[in-house]
Curated annotation (Swiss-Prot):
Protein origin, superkingdom: Bacteria
Protein name: Ribonuclease HIII
EC number from the UniProt entry: 3.1.26.4
Gene Ontology CC: one annotated term: cytoplasm
Length: 312
């Protein structure tokens, strides 16, 4: 399905609205008018942007906005690509979407957690009221607070790849990208079993690999490939991804707290110098084998921690 976007003046919008019949009532927040014309949806936003959506979007846009189509024939594609992040923010939250994201992939300690969540357009106002946002902008305390509310009413699937299984798969030659592709795909399929898929508009995955790479690792088993989109920095473009990010991060934080209690010391997130020091302390107190049960063995932190202990 093609999406073509124009930025119009008030005068041009008035002209467009005189050419076909638009609905102006009971519209999502931020939308000024909507029309169906020749199997194409035409959305006019309060921002002055107009989106043509459908298999005939290009032909319809040329018919209804001939002056813009002629002027922009050679440059609109590049311009729309440059503006795609902004437009996707508008688009996804106007539709019913499954979003998926993961946590723990860049952390030496702790598991890899993946969540897929189904967010309808009716959920959007309450999610905004709750303060749902990119999890990277939220404190751990806020993530826990939000997640405990979200899991109560958002259909979702949360999968956890614990360190023992993670290390086994990595030793078999699985890259982290392959692990994530398999987990994302499985979580999405789990959510599809919980909902009426006829109500689903898009599946939006926080992009960690190109579509063809994801498809390869998922054994070409993407459930609804035509509805599946990949978005970089997806948390800021889709509330469905933001919700999935919060829930997956919540699960990761919970496991990290459990690890800290298990080891009887505060375990830092990430993979920096502080992590090396704590890993060295764990080796000294409990041994390397214990460290491997709560960490990702292939990270450089393991080697660095051992080097810290050598002079001792």
């Amino acid at each position: 399905m093609a999406n073509i976007v124009f930025k119009l003046s008030d005068k041009d919008i008035t002209t467009l609205m005189s050419r076909i019949t638009f609905d102006t009532e009971n519209l999502p927040q931020g939308m000024k008018a909507r029309a169906k014309y020749q199997n194409t949806t035409v959305n006019i936003y309060q921002s002055g942007k107009v989106m043509f959506q459908g298999n005939h979007a290009e032909a319809v846009s040329k018919e209804l906005l001939p002056q813009h189509s002629q002027l922009n024939t050679n440059k609109t594609k590049k311009k729309n690509m440059a503006n795609s992040s902004l437009e996707q923010t508008l688009m996804y939250d106007q539709f019913n979407c499954i979003g998926s994201d993961e946590a723990g992939s860049g952390d030496y300690f702790g598991p890899l957690t993946v969540c897929a969540a189904f967010v309808t357009k009716e959920h959007v106002p309450i999610l905004k009221t709750l303060g749902v946002d990119d999890s990277k902008k939220l404190t751990d305390t806020k993530i826990v607070e939000l997640a405990e509310q979200l899991v109560a009413f958002i259909p979702h699937s949360l999968l956890t790849l614990h360190n023992d299984k993670y290390n086994i798969q990595q030793a078999k030659g699985w890259t982290q990208v392959k692990m994530k592709a398999v987990l994302h795909n499985e979580a999405i399929k789990n959510v599809l079993e919980k909902i009426d898929s006829s109500q689903l508009d898009y599946i939006v995955i926080d992009q960690f690999a190109k579509r063809e790479v994801y498809s390869h690792y998922a054994l070409s088993d993407i459930p609804l490939p035509k509805k599946t989109k990949f978005e970089t920095k997806g948390e800021s473009k889709s509330l469905a991804i933001a919700v999935a990010s919060i829930i997956s991060r919540y699960a990761f934080i919970t496991y990290m707290d459990q690890i800290s209690k298990y080891i009887n010391m505060t375990i830092p997130k990430g993979a920096g110098a502080k992590v090396d020091v704590i890993a060295a302390k764990i080796i000294k107190k409990y041994g390397l084998s214990r460290l491997d049960t709560i960490s990702k063995k292939h990270f450089k932190n393991r080697e660095k921690a051992q080097k810290i202990l050598k002079p001792l």
